[in-house]
Amino acid sequence: MTKKYILALDQGTTSSRAILFNEAGEIIGIEQKEFQQIFPKPGWVEHDANEIWASVLSVIAGVLLKTNVEAKEIAAIGITNQRETAVVWEKESGRPIYNALVWQSRQTAGICERLRAEGFSEMVTEKTGLLIDPYFSGTKVRWILDHVDGAQERAERGELLFGTIDTWLIWKLSGGKAHVTDYSNASRTLLYNIYEQCWDDELLKMLNVPRAMLPDVRPSSEVYAETVSYHFFGEEIPIAGAAGDQQAALFGQACFEKGMAKNTYGTGCFMLMNTGNQGVKSKHGLLTTIAWGLDGKVEYALEGSIFVAGSAIQWLRDGLRMMKSAKESEGYATKVTSADGVYVVPAFVGLGTPYWDSDVRGAVFGLTRGTSKEHFIRATLESLAYQTKDVLQAMEADSGISLKTLRVDGGAVANNFLMQFQSDLLGVSVERPTVQETTALGAAYLAGLAVGFWTSKEEITNNWNLEQKFSAEMEETDRAKLYEGWQKAVRAAQAFK
């Protein structure tokens, strides 16, 4: 029987998904399962790593059943994951010693404050391209070792293992044979030197994390291990690709050339620009990260994070009850010709790139007696585009590259009004692909390349199909005036603390 499919496991923040792709990069089937979010205290977010594993097994079985595909028809498995989320488990039993600490969780804020006070900020950014922030894995590992009795000593003796979610899943699928991560996930831990490509002694010492816990760092496209047959319907299938979700989306969007960029419009927005084999050190509040390791080379990216995007539309729907479904936002927005001077700054949890202001809160400016629900909804949608322009300006300033085209994916890209406004505001074309599951597709491509299912990046580029292109129609003067209003609104929101 021929190997016809690649299985992508997309392990996200609220659900796990299994997606089958064929050789053309088309979706054959999807299965999804949500799992529990654990909030022990305000600002803390945890997951049960065993429940994540159970959800992954469930969606693998579900997608094979739904599509009538047999396990032996799968050429390889690729994994993409919510990044930074940290798991610590016992090497012998495979039992996690504590819940996984999720990327969103702020429970390590105290550790971060101490590190900043001790003057580590510059060294950390210099080596990792990141900031000292609870977002990244390193302080999460420290927290678990501090809060579980005897964990530090056990870790030093080599009895405990640490991994991001990709590492946990590869370890489980391989029956404990492979304790590995890829370059892209390692680059999000705060423990990895992205320029020398190694776990860094100075960073490990800063957080007192024992080297014995750490996974091997491997290329993003390589056979790491095979599934143990009892976890995979009697088959030993190569586990052959891994990348963090945003890097996988960059790969799935075929952004292989230096200067190509994608923006994912999900709960938040994540914009990544490929900077080639040079890590660009940001002076404008961006993160420098590894995009992937492939063919013996590491490629880098600049990343901008917008905390609130699609969740602002959910707020209109659930919090303000302005509409019944997020889809309706487009209809409301197009009933008016402009937002009539209204600006929504959706800083519900602070502002990300380029401001990194965690104290600012949401604000609305420019309301008059004539402001309608339609204006309000339109202004909220426009805020996603304004925040994206903030990030793009920082990227262009850091990289010296002028973007010509932005490739987009994520739930909110179905909104044609938003995509057109985004193009108008940036003054560049916005391209929406036919296959919008680009994160899973990226993981599938990485795995497929490792086993010869696809042979080159050129083949993948040829698979990329345009569904719709949005071209800028706005006059430069109008664009500048609108954006100036946004900048004024952000400054005013920041002043109100």
UniProtKB/Swiss-Prot annotation:
GO terms for MF: ATP binding; glycerol kinase activity
UniProt: glycerol binding residues: R83, E84, Y135, D245, Q246
GO terms (BP aspect): glycerol catabolic process; glycerol metabolic process; glycerol-3-phosphate metabolic process
Post-translational modification Phosphohistidine, affected residues: H231
GO CC annotation terms, alphabetical: cytosol
Keywords: ATP-binding, Glycerol metabolism, Kinase, Nucleotide-binding, Phosphoprotein, Transferase
CDD domains (UniProt xref): FGGY_EcGK_like
PTM (free text): The phosphoenolpyruvate-dependent sugar phosphotransferase system (PTS), including enzyme I, and histidine-containing protein (HPr) are required for the phosphorylation, which leads to the activation of the enzyme.
Binding site for ATP: T13, T14, S15, T267, G310, Q314, G411
Disulfide bonds: none
PROSITE patterns: FGGY_KINASES_1 (PS00933), FGGY_KINASES_2 (PS00445)
Listed HAMAP family: Glycerol_kin
Function: Key enzyme in the regulation of glycerol uptake and metabolism. Catalyzes the phosphorylation of glycerol to yield sn-glycerol 3-phosphate.
UniProt protein name: Glycerol kinase
Species of the source: Halalkalibacterium halodurans (strain ATCC BAA-125 / DSM 18197 / FERM 7344 / JCM 9153 / C-125)
